[in-house]
Amino acid sequence: MKASASGGSAKSAHQGSVNIRRVAAADVAQIIALDAEMTGVEKADYWYSRFHEFGTRDLRNRFFFVAEADRHIVGYIIGEVRDWEFGQPPCGWVFAIGVRSDCRLTGVASRLLEALCDGLRAAGVTKVRTLLAFDDLLVMSFYRSQGMMAARMITLERNLDTEGAT
């Protein structure tokens, strides 16, 4: 989960209703802007690619939801069912979740995650997983509050910037 520094009026998310729905092509520009506020990098090609991959194909196993308040995107989540990777039976994965910082603590991220979990259950899986940086306490706290805990798998990595570096 990432947070933005700004992004419009929080009034709409706090006082109006927030609707969780599948992403539409018209939402992508707002998602790009929201992500750029959170990360400091505009990644238009990346987000259009994510829309085409998760918002238009195999919608039974791929999910891209947005949280909308008064026609403004205040959050998003992307996930899918992955089959037999790393020798594991099919399970759901959360790839991205983001909520405007002024909409935190209003239940938006929880509602997005629950919408994804509902889709994953309907697709027949019984577990959901994600990856996050071990020192990202905000994200860790959110996922722990949602009942997620350390899994029995670990991530290994190798730095490819220099030959032989780890």
Question: Can you say where each PLM-predicted feature lies in the sequence?
Answer:
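Conserved active-site alpha-helix within GNAT-family acetyltransferase domains
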Residues: 110, 134-152
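Conserved N-terminal entry element of GNAT/NAT acetyltransferase domains
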Residues: 1-26, 161-166
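Conserved beta-strand-loop-alpha-helix junction that forms the acyl-donor binding cleft
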Residues: 130-139, 157, 161
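Acetyl-CoA-dependent GNAT
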Residues: 22-26, 33-90, 95, 100, ...
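Active-site acidic-Proline motif in GNAT/NAT acetyltransferases
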Residues: 100-102, 106, 135
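Conserved GNAT acetyl-CoA-binding A-motif
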Residues: 120-132
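Short hydrophobic/aromatic beta-strand or adjacent loop that forms the aromatic wall/cage
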Residues: 62, 151-155
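Conserved acetyl-CoA-binding loop-helix of GNAT-fold acetyltransferases
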Residues: 105-118, 145
